[in-house]
C-alpha cells in the first residue's frame, strides 16, 4: 500500500495537527507500506493568472513559466493517483483552510486526471478506491458547525475527485479544553483498525 501524507499547518514545530497525523500514520502503517510525504509549506504553492491561463494553452505553446507550474501540478496529481491511503492534517484558520491547502486543491483539480466532464456538462471524479483520513484541528471552531467552512469544503473537493471514503479525526475547540480535545482525537485514532 502507498500512504500519502499531506501536512498543511504553517507551524513546523508544536503543530497539533502534524502530531496527530504522525500518531495516525504510526497506527495504520504496515512495515511493507510506502509513505509519500508532502509538506505544503515547503514550497510556495499558489495559483496565479499564469497557472489559470496555462491550463488553456496547448502544451507546445506554453512558456517555461507555464511548464514549471505544471511540473508541480503534475507531481501533486501523480501523488494522489498512486496513493491508496491519504492522510491530510489541517488546522482551521479563520473558519477555513490554510491558503496552501486551497492552492493544492486547485493544482490537483485537473481535467482528465482527477475529474472529467460528461457529455451533459456534469463532472465525475476519476480517483476511486482510496481511504482518506482528515486530521482536523481548531482553536475555537467546532468541527461540522455552521462556522466550519473547512470540513464541508474539503470533503466536497475530495468527492469531486471521486474519493468518497473519508474519515475525520477531530481535535476541535482546543482553546476551550486542550487536553480533552487531544484525548478525544487520540481515542478516535486508537479505534481505527
Question: Residue ranges of each PLM-predicted region?
Answer:
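Short histidine/acidic/glycine/proline-rich micro-motifs that form metal-
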Residues: 10-12, 139-142, 173-176
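Hydrophobic residues at beta-strand termini and immediately following loops
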Residues: 38, 135, 169
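Glycine-rich phosphate/pyrophosphate-binding loop and the adjoining helix
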Residues: 144-193
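Glycine-rich, flexible loop/turn motifs
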Residues: 46, 122-123, 165
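Residues at the starts of beta-strands that form the adenosine-phosphate
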Residues: 2, 34, 130-132, 164-165
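N-terminal beta1-alpha1-beta2 submodule of the flavodoxin-like/Rossmannoid cofactor-binding fold
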Residues: 1-90, 95-103, 188-193
Amino acid at each position: 500500500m502507498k500512504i500519502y501524507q499531506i501536512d498543511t499547518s504553517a507551524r513546523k514545530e508544536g503543530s497539533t495537527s502534524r502530531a496527530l497525523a504522525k500518531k495516525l500514520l504510526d497506527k495504520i502503517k504496515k512495515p511493507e507500506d510506502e509513505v509519500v510525504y508532502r509538506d505544503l509549506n515547503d514550497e510556495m504553492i499558489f495559483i496565479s493568472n499564469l497557472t489559470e491561463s496555462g491550463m488553456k494553452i496547448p502544451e507546445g505553446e506554453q512558456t517555461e513559466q507555464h511548464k514549471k507550474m505544471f511540473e508541480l501540478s503534475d507531481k501533486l496529481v501523480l501523488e494522489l493517483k498512486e496513493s491508496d491511503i491519504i492522510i491530510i492534517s489541517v488546522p482551521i484558520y479563520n473558519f477555513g483552510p490554510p491558503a496552501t491547502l486551497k492552492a493544492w486543491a486547485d493544482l490537483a483539480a485537473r481535467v482528465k486526471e482527477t475529474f472529467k466532464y460528461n457529455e451533459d456538462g456534469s463532472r465525475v471524479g476519476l480517483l476511486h478506491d482510496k481511504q482518506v483520513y482528515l486530521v482536523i484541528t481548531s482553536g475555537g471552531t467546532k468541527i461540522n458547525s455552521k462556522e466550519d467552512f473547512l470540513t464541508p469544503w474539503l470533503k466536497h473537493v475530495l468527492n469531486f475527485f471521486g474519493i468518497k471514503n473519508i474519515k475525520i479525526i477531530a481535535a476541535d475547540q482546543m482553546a476551550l479544553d486542550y487536553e480533552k480535545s487531544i484525548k478525544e482525537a487520540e481515542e478516535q485514532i486508537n479505534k481505527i483498525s
